[in-house]
UniProtKB/Swiss-Prot annotation:
Pfam family, one: NusB
Function (record text): Involved in transcription antitermination. Required for transcription of ribosomal RNA (rRNA) genes. Binds specifically to the boxA antiterminator sequence of the ribosomal RNA (rrn) operons.
Coiled-coil parts of chain: none
Gene: nusB
Region described as Disordered: spans on this chain: 1-30
Record-level Gene Ontology MF annotations: RNA binding
UniProt-recorded name of the protein: Transcription antitermination protein NusB
Keywords: RNA-binding, Transcription, Transcription antitermination, Transcription regulation
Any GO CC annotation of this UniProt entry: cytosol
Record organism: Pseudomonas fluorescens (strain SBW25)
């Protein structure tokens, strides 16, 4: 007898049919993590963006990550690097060249989301940036990233920030 998933259906099982599958938010978080690593690799090694993306597709399991979002981040940050760095500069006490490379990658990714992904709420962008800095940055790097993003968000998303603070 041929078995398929419908054979396992149990109407008393409270779990949704897609239980165990990552949510959209979880897939985006994984895409941000992989993109942070890829942006760092690009910054340090200087390999081409297409080579890095191809390597990441081979070396990583994208089952739990949003591959199109990973692609958008990687290419979006690269394409808009001048605008991103210009947006970050007034919020920094250091020059771009003086920043920790990992924290710079995280802040560039977050700035890209604030500038070009208005579908992602600014509070989510800040929180995700902080979490990335906690995982990949220096011991207190997340505090620095938080401070910069807290200054950057109102500059780039003034109406959204004001609406939230009411």
């Amino acid at each position: 007898m041929i078995s398929d998933e419908s054979d396992n259906f149990n109407p008393r099982d409270p779990r949704p049919a897609d239980a165990g599958k990552p949510s959209k938010n979880e897939k985006r978080r994984a895409a941000r993590q992989l993109a942070t690593q890829a942006l760092y690799q690009r910054q340090i090694a200087g390999a081409s963006l297409n080579e890095i993306e191809a390597q990441f597709r081979v070396d990583n399991d994208f089952t739990f990550a949003d591959l199109p979002y990973f692609h958008d981040i990687l290419h979006g940050v690269h394409a808009h690097l001048t605008e991103i760095d210009a947006a970050l500069a007034p919020c920094l006490d250091l020059t771009i060249d003086e920043l920790d490379p990992v924290e710079l990658c995280v802040m560039r990714l977050s700035a890209w989301e604030l500038l070009y992904r208005v579908d992602v709420p600014y509070r989510v962008v800040i929180n995700e940036g902080i979490e990335l800095a906690k995982v990949y940055g220096s011991t207190d790097g997340h505090k620095f990233v938080n401070g910069v993003l807290d200054k950057l968000a109102p500059r780039l998303r003034e109406a959204e920030v004001k609406a939230y603070k009411r």
